[in-house]
Structures are given as C-alpha cells and as structure tokens.
Amino acid sequence: MKVQYCDSLVIGGGLAGLRAAVATQQKGLSTIVLSLIPVKRSHSAAAQGGMQASLGNSKMSDGDNEDLHFMDTVKGSDWGCDQKVARMFVNTAPKAIRELAAWGVPWTRIHKGDRMAIINAQKTTITEEDFRHGLIHSRDFGGTKKWRTCYTADATGHTMLFAVANECLKLGVSIQDRKEAIALIHQDGKCYGAVVRDLVTGDIIAYVAKGTLIATGGYGRIYKNTTNAVVCEGTGTAIALETGIAQLGNMEAVQFHPTPLFPSGILLTEGCRGDGGILRDVDGHRFMPDYEPEKKELASRDVVSRRMIEHIRKGKGVQSPYGQHLWLDISILGRKHIETNLRDVQEICEYFAGIDPAEKWAPVLPMQHYSMGGIRTDYRGEAKLKGLFSAGEAACWDMHGFNRLGGNSVSEAVVAGMIVGEYFAEHCANTQVDLETKTLEKFVKGQEAYMKSLVESKGTEDVFKIKNRMKDVMDDNVGIFRDGPHLEKAVKELEELYKKSKNVGIKNKRLHANPELEEAYRVPMMLKVALCVAKGALDRTESRGAHNREDYPKRDDINWLNRTLASWPNPEQTLPTLEYEALDVNEMEIAPGYRGYGAKGNYIENPLSVKRQEEIDKIQSELEAAGKDRHAIQEALMPYELPAKYKARNERLGDK
C-alpha cells in the first residue's frame, strides 16, 4: 500500500486551490496540491474579462466601495446568497487585487487624459485626471452600479493563475499533476485525506492529511453545450457527495452565459459587452433595450440569457447549419480597442469562426457556463464532514446564491483561497491524524478492487453512449427555461442511466493509461451530480436567479427562501436525498425585495422582509443622526467574521 503524508492536502490546481496552498505553506505546513493536469492549464486560465474589486480608481468607478459591491452581489444572487459570506468577500477583494499586483499580475493601468469609450452604443469621451494615472483600471460588467472589474486586457485568469502558481513554487508547495482523487478517506465523521489514482501508472495511492480542501471547479461538463474545459466534470464534488456525510448546496443553480461563440462554445468574455459591444438579431436590430431598457446588454447574466432565448423563440434568431443563434457586435468598438483590450476574443473568433470581429459580427448563443452549487460549507469553508474544506467553484460557500455576477468568479476563487485558506491552515495546525490503519487499508483496497472489477466486467453497456445521453438530457430538459414535465423526464431518464452505468463493459483491460477506464468510474459520479441538479430543479417550484421555472414564474420568498442541500447517504440509493436550509431574513443586511429586472410584482413577498426592512431603516437613520460612519452602520446591521489579517479597512482615493 502506497501512502503519502502531509499536513494539508489540496485537491485541484486552479486559482482557489493554489491560493489556499499558499496560505497553508506560509504557516509552515507541508502542503501537497493534486491536479488532473499541469496546474497552469487549469480552467481558471480561461477567465477573460476581469476580477471585481471596489478600488474606485477610475473616473467611472468614482465613489465605489464595499457597500455597493455587496448590494450588487446580493441583488445579483436574487437574495439566495449568504450575506455574511458576501460581506467577507467584498471586504477582502481589494486586498486580493493588490496582493496579486505585488506577485506580478500586470493589471491594466489608467492613462491620464481623454479616452474614447462606447457607452450605450454611443461614442463617449472620458477624462481621467492626473492623480489617477498609473492606478489599476476597471471596466463595466453586468449587474453592477460602478465600473468595478479590474483586468489584464482579456487574459485576466491566465495572468492571475500564473502569478499564484509561481508563488506556490517559490514557497515550495509540492504540486503533483496527473493525479485524480477518486475517494475521500474518512472515519468517525472526520476526513483524513484521499485515495488517489495516478493517471499515468494506474497506481492507487493514499494521501493522508490533517485537513483536505477540494477546489476542483464546476460541473459544467454534465451538459453538452458548455464553456467549461473537459476537466470540469464535477467529480471532485461527487467524491464529497459519496462520503454520505458531506452535502451539496443549491445544485440546481446553474448559470448560462449569454455569449459563447456558436457553435464551438468557447467563451467570448462579458468584457465585450462591458466595453460597449451590443447584441443584434437576424434583422441587425439591437434588441436588449426592448426587454431591459435600463441595463440593456449589461443586465445580470441569467436575465440576458433568458431574453436572448425569448427573442429567438419569437422568430428573430439567425438560421445556420448548426441551429439558430444571435449576433454579438463589437465592431463598433474599433480595431484599436479590440486589438488592445480584446485580443483573445479576436483570436478566438478568427480561429474558431473564421471572422475578424473588428469587421464582422460574431455568432453567439447562451450555453452552460458556471456552477453556483457545490460542496456546502460554512463561512470558514468547512463541510459537514469535519476536516473537509472547499473553495472556489467547487464549493457552495454561497456568496453567489442563484446567480453569479460577471467578474465575481475569479475574484471569489482568489478571495476564498485567502479566507478559507486561513481557516484551513488553522485547522491543519491544530489537528492530529487519528486514523486506524485498517480503515486506511479498507479505503485503498476498496478502490483497487473497484478498478479491477471495472476492467474485468462482462457488462454490456457502453459508457460513452451513457455519457453522451446524459449531456443531451441535461441540455434538453434542465436548461435556461425549465418546467415540471421536462424536469420529471430528466430525473427519470438520468436515474435509468445511472443504473446502466453500473453495468458497463470496457474493451481496454489495462489498469494504467486507460481513458476508457477513467470514463467508467467518472460517469456514475457525473450522473449523481446531474441527478442532484435535476431533482433540485424539479422540487424547487419557483423562479430565482438562474433557476427559471416557466410553470412557476415568480420568486417565492414565503416558501423558497432557502438553500437546497443534497446528500447520498446510502450507496444503494439511485436518487439524492434533499433537505433545505432556511435563510434567516432577520439576519440579513439587505432584506429581500425587487431585484431590478422585469415586472416589479414578479415575486411573492415574505412578510418578514417588510419587518426586517423597517428595522434596517430605523437602525440606519438613528446611527446616521448620531454621526456614525458607514462602517459602524454596517456592523450594527450585520456583524460578520474575518481572519485577523484581512479585517483592516480598504483605502481609496479621496478617503479622509
């Protein structure tokens, strides 16, 4: 039995995992990062548009602060987020930006003087004063009051990932790629590491640790049409589910991005629209102002995606050999702007669509993009299975609720890596491994036997056909628009596919370097994740954020102001067990209300929301009359916790 020991085990080599590894290594803890691929190829590198942080540096971000970022995030979540976690996030994001700058991220900087921008499809001159020169710049993104998204042209995730990975290397973090965690080792409700398969040799290795953190990204690849990389299959989430103890939160909350390139599915950043790009239909008409006259193309992603599909349903889609699509027009920005700030977008359009976006419109169609759901954790990032932590897209830390704002993803990845990383390091420093050898042997031998049984199986089912059918079922029935009959059909067929996945036969009988074997053990896990999504969507009879039920079109704050918790306590069951965690209105800093999109009466109000809003107004007016500043008012409305090193107030231009 091969065993490796460490203080801190991080599963996943993207931004969240690597930043958490920095936190533990800085505390003198021996840290191992496991990754399916070389870490600098992680999906974090695909993030283009930027990272939200309320610096308030540029002219168009004047007056920005944590309060505005917090309000945008809560409204964007459709009041589904944990507001205390959202506060932790917005307070730490400016610190993260500056830390990354110190580590070498070449943030795009402000140039003093006049510059031309496209706002609402009109050329506008913005004048940046001399005192702003050289400060970190920001661009506009959907669902925000200020231009808050800091960026490095349109390669933000790439530069951030390289900087954090290099910091790990500098600190001596042990990074091991081509390693896949296939089960968590746990005893008496505590996690002590993972059983890992070497993807090259096929060896099964036990990694024993004082604490384990999962940061394996989202589960987009359960869908056919997705912007996610091929490694984003949700198996990191699934191994937590398979413990029978850890729970998954809000798995039905799946975001569809408005502007993936059609039909390839490669993302064209929200920065295209933030910089002034517009959406057009088959007639060349700019249609978003018809639906959302205030925010237009920069409404929240769930809203824009729905409006696009509605418009196609009205017969305004562009016909193509691959299906219908709409147009993204960034030609109005001019070639210089595109070649300076949207270079990756230009290359993607040229390589994968054969067009120059400075001259022609790009074909786009909403596709699956982000997973708001994940391993449910507390504010410290710890799951119900003690000693198991999670961060980034793999987690339901729950600062996104039922819809994520653009730019809050890579921001959360780094900020969660910082905050959760501190709590994770504290846990690892104060924990001893109390694991019996026979328990360790049981987990390792169990996985060795499972791999052997898969290659020796006489099963008749084709794992590739099962996987492809799962993707079709999810696309057809659990997409942007949902309803009871389609969701019932999805749950029924996914359950049948899950049963079939237990009877697969594979032709390649090797235990090493065998992609067919990998599919054989991954697909049942992916189907469990897909069932959590579909069953959660079926049972949630309301529309909230990215979860849109055409048969229940209103947000229901009386019955559904809660968080879905999915678990799989019995390995023999074929459907997840669902329960719900109430969101306490009386602890919210912003009471549930009108989100700002569509009809004002399109939600069922909870009477507690009215009462809470009255309390908020009373506290605020009394403290303002007493001369208290916004920080004191915020503390009175909703206290929250942060690691000591991140509690300091953020400084901005014009602060007194």
Curated annotation (Swiss-Prot):
Tele-8alpha-FAD histidine: modified positions: 43
Provide the alphabetized UniProt keywords: Cell inner membrane, Cell membrane, Electron transport, FAD, Flavoprotein, Membrane, Oxidoreductase, Respiratory chain, Transport
What, per the annotation, is the impact of changing residue 301 to K?
A: No growth on fumarate, retains FAD cofactor, 15-fold decreased enzyme activity in vitro
Which reactions does this protein catalyse? a quinone + succinate = fumarate + a quinol
Q: Which Pfam families match?
A: FAD_binding_2 (PF00890), Succ_DH_flav_C (PF02910)
Q: How does it sit in the membrane?
A: Peripheral membrane protein
Keyword Transmembrane appears in the UniProt entry: no
This entry's comment on the bound cofactor is:
Binds 1 FAD covalently per subunit.
**Quaternary structure, from the entry:** Part of an enzyme complex containing three subunits: a flavoprotein (frdA), an iron-sulfur protein (frdB), and diheme cytochrome b (frdC).
| Its job | The fumarate reductase enzyme complex is required for fumarate respiration using formate or sulfide as electron donor.
Family per similarity comment: Belongs to the FAD-dependent oxidoreductase 2 family. FRD/SDH subfamily.
Q: What is the name of this protein?
A: Fumarate reductase flavoprotein subunit
Protein species of origin: Wolinella succinogenes (strain ATCC 29543 / DSM 1740 / CCUG 13145 / JCM 31913 / LMG 7466 / NCTC 11488 / FDC 602W) (Vibrio succinogenes)
